[in-house]
A protein has these predicted regions:
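Conserved phosphate-chemistry cores used by DNA topoisomerases
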Residues: 1-305
């Protein structure tokens, strides 16, 4: 039976490819490209993995947690351990300043921190070879344990934690491009999130209100009355560890990065992260937003940190 089915499929496929030469040529090119990539990877994978293993012994970029998604459930306290597995989280931050506050305020049982060094590489259009050649990408894939697929994923929640400014938004896009380019299923399966942190702190001697938008700030000012102290958080590193603990605890606000199963990922990446095109230039011009300089526009009672 097996031989019959294989012969039947082989003949049917052969007939189809002969009748559809463009499709056959496209498949041929894809096979040849995959073979070239495989040969390139084989030469650097061993070296990169050896470097990563050495780094993992004392990876300065990773502050790991105790419980991971891929951990075996012990005989005792099964339910409690399962809850911690599902809560396992890794925060990907920009720089040591931001990671410092998170590291000091995190739950060491289920929250890990991975610190990037500034803006990562734009990986759109690159082959997977760059994942092994680029030190940060290689260390990140080993921290997540996704080199061979998602079965060994170590964290259920991958949270991108960047400043809420233009540079921070750019870093978010670069990290998401990395995942969508090389590990799209990690996004499709709902593991990737964006951390929301407050933009303002409005307080008087009796009450403190954290605000995530200008509208929330105005409501807080109206509620407290008088002249409350208003603090504008310019970056994650400027939020104290004591305060940060409130934003990554039970009341954490994180937006899921959602993408449908049939979304044209490559077309989206090409449009937003590829080379400049007239269409993208037009989109940028039509959606350009000029931000006010808070340092200049600051009200007398506001404090900038």
């Amino acid at each position: 039976m097996k031989t019959f089915i294989l012969d039947f499929l082989s003949k049917a496929l052969d007939d189809f490819l002969h009748k559809n030469a463009p499709i056959a040529e496209s498949i041929k090119k894809r096979i040849e490209q995959s073979e070239r990539e495989r040969k390139e990877l084989s030469g650097i994978r061993k070296i990169a993995n050896e470097r990563a293993k050495k780094a993992n012994l004392h990876n300065k970029k990773l502050r790991d947690c105790r419980v991971h998604l891929n951990a075996e459930i012990p005989a005792k306290n099964k339910e409690e351990f399962q809850i911690k597995k599902l809560a396992s989280t890794i925060f990907i931050t920009e720089g040591d300043s931001a990671s410092g506050s998170i590291t000091k305020s995190r739950d060491v049982d289920s929250q890990a921190v991975f610190s990037l060094r500034g803006k990562p590489l734009n990986s759109f259009g690159l082959t997977k070879k760059v994942v092994y050649e680029n030190e940060e990408f290689n260390l990140l894939q080993h921290a997540l344990n996704i080199e061979d697929g998602l079965d060994g994923l170590r964290y259920n929640n991958i949270v991108i934690a960047t400043d809420a400014d233009v540079d921070g938004m750019h870093i978010r896009l670069l990290i998401m491009t990395f995942f969508l380019q090389f590990f799209p299923d990690i996004v499709r399966n709902g593991h990737v999130y964006i951390l929301e942190t407050p933009l303002f702190r409005v307080r008087n001697k009796k009450e403190t209100i954290y605000c995530y938008s200008e509208a929330e700030k105005q409501k807080a000012i109206a509620k407290l009355g008088g002249k409350p102290e208003i603090t504008r958080f310019k970056g994650l590193g400027e939020i104290s560890p004591d305060e940060f603990g409130k934003f990554i605890g039970e009341d954490i606000k994180k937006d899921p990065v959602l993408i449908s199963k049939d979304a044209p990922i490559q077309k989206l990446l090409e449009y937003y992260m590829g080379t400049n095109t007239p269409a993208r230039q037009k989109f940028i011009i039509e959606n350009l937003v000029v931000e006010k300089d808070d340092a200049i526009e600051m009200e007398p009672e506001e404090v900038l940190v």
